[in-house]
Amino acid sequence: MLDIHNPTTDHQDIRDLTIIGGGPTGIFAAFQCGMNNISCRIIESMSQLGGQLAALYPEKHIYDVAGFPEVPAIDLVESLWAQAERYNPDVVLGEAVTKYTKLDDGTFETRTNAGNVYRSRAVLIAAGLGAFEPRKLPQLGNIDHLTGSSVYYAVKSVDNFKGKRVVIVGGGDSALDWTVGLLKNAESVTLVHRAKEFQGHGKTAHEVEQAKADGLIDVHLQTEVASIEESNGALTHVHLRSSNGEEWTVEADRLLILIGFKSNLGPLAGWDLELAENALVVDSHMKTSVDGLYAAGDIAHYPGKLKIIQTGLSEATMAVRHSLSYIKPGEKIRNVFSSVKMAKEKKAAEQEKKAE
């Protein structure tokens, strides 16, 4: 977990920008605030920064972020924070924003479920898909007592699957990634998917097919989990059923269900902001239907939107950049080149050190 403290001592101390959400997009937005010489405060509902990457997939490897041929999710989060941390953004953890109010002077108040109110000159919503919970298999009934010991909806540590007989349910990117990713750790891996074809990335799907051809895994398409067996509070068997009615049983110690998440905008849905496809509609400046209120990342919607990390980082840059005209009206917005800015900061730090 990142070593982050909360330096906020006065909730009424106004900041230039409130960033709602501390996932990759929100963290990078904080860095961009520093680059553009404005203050910010991140408010994150969870107890740590990083969003789903830190909470659900810390050991998952990511391949589609520029400059990183391959990077574990938690390492990407730590790298993003290393960038943002140099500008000392305020960070509020464990508080969910429930309401915002735009005041007569154009500034904003954001209220959290802890009863705290934070003021800023503008707001950037980078809350991902909102609150999320894993999709479950209704035919299995209530299996909460097995969750975290035999049944999992995410891989937080591969050690939980080391030497185990694992049944994975799903056909998307996560299911395919972990089918390949757990090969080195699990005793056996069985992949079950109810459709005829995988929905995940073609490259990973090919790797799964190759592993099947090599006899490293079992793959059952057009098949679903019918029921499970347990003994002394631990999973022992998974019963499978094919689309043609054939049934059989596999021995299993772990059931990894990776069939996606249900997202819920929560209070955001009642904020009188224009919505489309369960997201906030933004213009080319990442502005929502309310002046001074911006959105970036998965929570933002516009024609042709791609919901990937790389897009969110770009949108964070644009949102912060365009928020300057609202935060500092009348001021000329100048281009900021990172190499020049960093050189000036380094020189200033050296001069300050000499003066001591």
UniProtKB/Swiss-Prot annotation:
<dbReference type="GO" id="GO:0050661">
    <property type="term" value="F:NADP binding"/>
</dbReference>
<dbReference type="InterPro" id="IPR036188">
    <property type="entry name" value="FAD/NAD-bd_sf"/>
</dbReference>
<dbReference type="GO" id="GO:0050660">
    <property type="term" value="F:flavin adenine dinucleotide binding"/>
</dbReference>
<feature type="binding site">
    <location>
        <position position="57"/>
    </location>
    <ligand>
        <name>FAD</name>
    </ligand>
</feature>
<keyword id="KW-0274">FAD</keyword>
<comment type="similarity">
    <text>Belongs to the ferredoxin--NADP reductase type 2 family.</text>
</comment>
<feature type="binding site">
    <location>
        <position position="44"/>
    </location>
    <ligand>
        <name>FAD</name>
    </ligand>
</feature>
<comment type="subunit">
    <text>Homodimer.</text>
</comment>
<feature type="binding site">
    <location>
        <position position="97"/>
    </location>
    <ligand>
        <name>FAD</name>
    </ligand>
</feature>
<dbReference type="InterPro" id="IPR050097">
    <property type="entry name" value="Ferredoxin-NADP_redctase_2"/>
</dbReference>
<feature type="binding site">
    <location>
        <position position="25"/>
    </location>
    <ligand>
        <name>FAD</name>
    </ligand>
</feature>
<protein>
    <recommendedName>
        <fullName>Ferredoxin--NADP reductase</fullName>
        <ecNumber>1.18.1.2</ecNumber>
    </recommendedName>
</protein>
<keyword id="KW-0285">Flavoprotein</keyword>
<keyword id="KW-0521">NADP</keyword>
<feature type="binding site">
    <location>
        <position position="52"/>
    </location>
    <ligand>
        <name>FAD</name>
    </ligand>
</feature>
<keyword id="KW-0560">Oxidoreductase</keyword>
<dbReference type="GO" id="GO:0004324">
    <property type="term" value="F:ferredoxin-NADP+ reductase activity"/>
</dbReference>
<feature type="binding site">
    <location>
        <position position="132"/>
    </location>
    <ligand>
        <name>FAD</name>
    </ligand>
</feature>
<dbReference type="InterPro" id="IPR023753">
    <property type="entry name" value="FAD/NAD-binding_dom"/>
</dbReference>
<dbReference type="Pfam" id="PF07992">
    <property type="entry name" value="Pyr_redox_2"/>
</dbReference>
<feature type="binding site">
    <location>
        <position position="298"/>
    </location>
    <ligand>
        <name>FAD</name>
    </ligand>
</feature>
<dbReference type="InterPro" id="IPR022890">
    <property type="entry name" value="Fd--NADP_Rdtase_type_2"/>
</dbReference>
<feature type="binding site">
    <location>
        <position position="339"/>
    </location>
    <ligand>
        <name>FAD</name>
    </ligand>
</feature>
